[in-house]
């Protein structure tokens, strides 16, 4: 019985290793992972939550909320159309830290962009 158990365990381990070689990790990536990799260090105006703007003083939560709700955008400069004059000056200060990619439903579903459930 012990030999049978060790044989079955060995077969399962070998099968798992073989599957790891046949199906690389990239096959398991989802749309959200891909989108996060595309934008790198920049904040994606079409796919980021309001919380992503906390790193830019003066933008969180008011300006960030307007940008998130006002999308989608085709370019970074389009986002300034939803802001007033004083908010535009703050936005322009950090403009180089933003990017725009196609909007993905997996990232934008529901109200996750407004409140993504991250609390201290």
From Swiss-Prot:
Gene3D superfamilies noted in UniProt: Photosystem II 12 kDa extrinsic protein
Organism: Prochlorococcus marinus (strain MIT 9303)
Function: One of the extrinsic, lumenal subunits of photosystem II (PSII). PSII is a light-driven water plastoquinone oxidoreductase, using light energy to abstract electrons from H(2)O, generating a proton gradient subsequently used for ATP formation. The extrinsic proteins stabilize the structure of photosystem II oxygen-evolving complex (OEC), the ion environment of oxygen evolution and protect the OEC against heat-induced inactivation.
A cellular component term, taken from the record's GO annotations: plasma membrane-derived thylakoid membrane
NCBIfam families reported in the protein's UniProt record: PRK02515.1 (NF002708)
Keyword Transport: yes
Annotated family: Belongs to the PsbU family.
Protein name: Photosystem II extrinsic protein U
Subcellular localization(s) per the UniProt record: Cellular thylakoid membrane
Keyword annotations: Electron transport, Membrane, Photosynthesis, Photosystem II, Signal, Thylakoid, Transport
Signal peptide (from-to): 1-29
Subunit structure: PSII is composed of 1 copy each of membrane proteins PsbA, PsbB, PsbC, PsbD, PsbE, PsbF, PsbH, PsbI, PsbJ, PsbK, PsbL, PsbM, PsbT, PsbX, PsbY, Psb30/Ycf12, peripheral proteins PsbO, CyanoQ (PsbQ), PsbU, PsbV and a large number of cofactors. It forms dimeric complexes.
Keyword ATP-binding found: no
InterPro entries (UniProt xref): PSII_PsbU
Residue intervals passing through the bilayer: none
Membrane topology according to the record: Peripheral membrane protein
Lineage, opening ranks: Bacteria, Bacillati, Cyanobacteriota, Cyanophyceae, Synechococcales
Pfam hit, one: PsbU
UniProt-listed GO biological process terms: photosynthesis; photosystem II stabilization
